[in-house]
């Protein structure tokens, strides 16, 4: 009987903890995107990826930071139009919403690398912020690779 009561108590406690966890972070996926900026800075220069929503599509733009006439300016390097639903699917496949709060410290004994700064507003006002230096969240490399792939496919057409 004592084992039975202990088992019921453990099950009840586990259930309550699980319910609290579910209520704490109810949005584990991106359902809408309002804005996104990804800045990559390395020895070769700085690239800035931005999105802008145009009707039912999302316009992805990549800018290159250049120094001109005494100031840094962003020059449009490439742009592509994609379906907003497809872009949201990419964000979910790469678990972008879980990046929030990520800060990737530069690994010891790594002499170079790319620094990134990511900000997105999703789901009607939820902000995702992540940054790092040669240390990235899970899904980051796939996300950047897919952004570049979208831009390259558009340049080919």
Give residue spans per PLM region.
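Positively charged n-region of N-terminal signal peptides that target proteins for export
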Residues: 1-4
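C-terminal motif of bacterial Sec signal peptides marking the signal peptidase cleavage site
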Residues: 18-21
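Short, well-ordered, aromatic-rich surface patches in folded extracellular/luminal domains
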Residues: 24-46, 93-94, 100-157
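Conserved, charge-rich beta-strand/loop surface module that forms ligand/interface-binding patches
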Residues: 25-31, 48, 73-82
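Post-signal-peptide N-terminal segment of Sec-exported extracytoplasmic proteins
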Residues: 41-69
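A short, structured loop/turn motif at beta-sheet edges
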Residues: 53-56, 81-89, 120-126
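A short-motif feature that recognizes glycine-rich, charge-decorated loops
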Residues: 62-99
């Amino acid at each position: 009987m004592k084992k039975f009561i202990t088992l019921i108590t453990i099950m009840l406690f586990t259930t309550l903890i699980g319910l609290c966890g579910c209520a704490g972070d109810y949005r584990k996926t991106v359902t809408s995107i309002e804005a996104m900026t990804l800045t990559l800075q390395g020895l070769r220069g700085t690239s800035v990826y931005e999105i802008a929503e145009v009707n039912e599509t999302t316009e992805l733009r990549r800018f290159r930071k250049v120094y001109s006439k005494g100031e840094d300016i962003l020059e449009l390097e490439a742009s592509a139009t994609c379906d907003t639903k497809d872009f949201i699917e990419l964000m979910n496949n790469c678990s972008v919403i879980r990046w929030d709060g990520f800060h990737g410290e530069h690994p010891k004994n790594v002499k170079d690398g790319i620094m990134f700064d990511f900000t997105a507003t999703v789901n009607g006002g939820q902000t995702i912020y992540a940054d790092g230096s040669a240390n990235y969240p899970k899904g980051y490399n796939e996300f950047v690779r897919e952004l570049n792939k979208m831009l390259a496919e558009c340049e080919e057409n």
